[in-house]
Structures are given as structure tokens and as C-alpha cells.
Amino acid sequence: MTDQQYQLLQKFKLDKSKISYRTHYNPMLLQPIPRTIHRELLGISSISLPFQGADFWTLYELSWLNKYGLPQVAIGEMIIDATSDNLIESQSLKLYLNSINQTCFSSEQELRNTLITDITKCINSQVKITIHSLSQWMTVPILEFTGECIDNQSIQIDNDNYIFNSNLLVNSVEREKVKETLVSHLLKSNCPITNQPDWGSVQISYYGMRINREALLRYLISFRKYKIFHEQCVEQIYCDIMQFCLPNTLSVYVRYNRRGGLDINPWRSNISYSPVNRPLARQ
């Protein structure tokens, strides 16, 4: 992220006077972040994206009042397409959902319609929202990323390897062409707005020249001090691998740990791809 882009993001920092939890419904709490801020750095045009994808959100702290004033709880799933103009700053979504806690809705469908209306306006695109009862969610099995884990390598990591560096992927491919899926649970980046850590697991599926595992792991570890949104991080990984490794096909899927009652799980791909939207062990 350039200094100019970082300064631009500062205007999106939440006003401290707004961070206190509101008990009255307020859709104005939602903070959109233009996707173009980071895509311009990557040389991506929103008119012709080099990938398809979506951002899977899980809303673990969804609560409201029914028409009798009785509190209700549920778990929500939200899918935002990568073509949306904006992403949502996660803390603002948390504050927005909290503003619903003391709001009466005549039905679960009215709540869902309200969420869809407000979030659609925020991202300037359609959104899919599903509300699950706790009993329904109890049946959702834990997902284990398929693929070969690259984390258990006997390599030395120096302090300068914790500074983001796309060039770690330079000359990182071998002549042999393969179709494989690689997994790492060591991804960590930081929120540009709150500076809080974001812990994630990444699954990289590709067909092309074999990617050197050590180089790839060093590259992923270099995000450790980097300030970048979840959605931007997956696009950075996708674009860097495409640029330096030149695969014919590529799919990148990252599932991030829950923070503030929310988890965000973005994926990007240049092929027909339908990732499984289920929680990992750390989620």
C-alpha cells in the first residue's frame, strides 16, 4: 500500500464518537471502502476484472427483537460479489449490527430485507443473505482445506522477511507443469483502519509451472506486518502469483479467523470455481 493510498484510507477511520455501541437502528454506521483504492495499485480495471470471486461473511452475533420484544439470535451468512463497487469496513458492520440488537422486527424476513437493503446501498451492488437458526448451524461440519500444507518447512525466517515483498516470488517456478493445491495456515496481515491482526488460512489451486514451496511460504509470511483488508489481501496474492508464476489457471481462497463476531472469507479465480463455504477449525 502506497503512502498516498494509506492517507486516503485515513478519512475512512471511524470517528471515535461513533465507535460507542448504539442501541437504535442506524444504517448510516455502515462504512463503504472503494475497491478501486487497492485495485489501482495492482493495475486492475474494475471494468474488466482479471478474475471472478466473492467475499463470504459470517455474522455470528446477529440479534434483534421480535414483535413481542423477545430477543432473537441467529447466525447470518452474507455473500458479496467481487464486482461490487465497495467493500464494507468490518468494524462499521459490527456497529451497524449492534444497532439492530434493540430493534423490533415483525418477522425474520423483515430483518433480512432490512439487511439486504442497507448493505446493498453500502456496497452499491446486490448481496445475498441467509439467516440460520442455531440448530441449523450446529449441523454445519468443520471444513479442512484440501491440498498439501507447505508450513512445516525447515527454513530460517529473518526479520526482513516480515516486511511485505512481492519480489519473493521472482524466479520461483520450475519448468515442470503441475496441477496442484497448496495450503498454508500462517497468513497474517493487519487491518489498515484499526491495526488489529487478521489471521488466515489460504488455499492456492493452480495449473502451471511448479511453484517453489519455500518461496511461496516466505512470500505469504511477508504479509505479517502489512496493513491490508482481507479482500485486498486475496487479490494481492492472486495478482502476484499470476505476475511472477504465470499459471494457466489460478484460484485463491482465504478464510480468516473471526474478529468482532465476524469472519470474512474471500476467493478469486480465473476459472469456474465453487469453493465450499464452511468454517475451518480456527473459526
Curated annotation (Swiss-Prot):
It is found in: Cytoplasm. The lineage of its organism: Bacteria, Pseudomonadati, Pseudomonadota, Gammaproteobacteria, Candidatus Palibaumannia. This is NADPH-dependent 7-cyano-7-deazaguanine reductase. It comes from Baumannia cicadellinicola subsp. Homalodisca coagulata. NADPH binds at S90, Q91, R259, G260. It is an enzyme of class 1 (oxidoreductase). Substrate binds at I88, E89, S90, H230, E231. Its main location: cytoplasm. The active site is at C191 (thioimide intermediate), D198 (proton donor). GO terms for biological process: queuosine biosynthetic process; tRNA modification. Keywords: Cytoplasm, NADP, Oxidoreductase, Queuosine biosynthesis. GO terms for cellular component: cytoplasm.
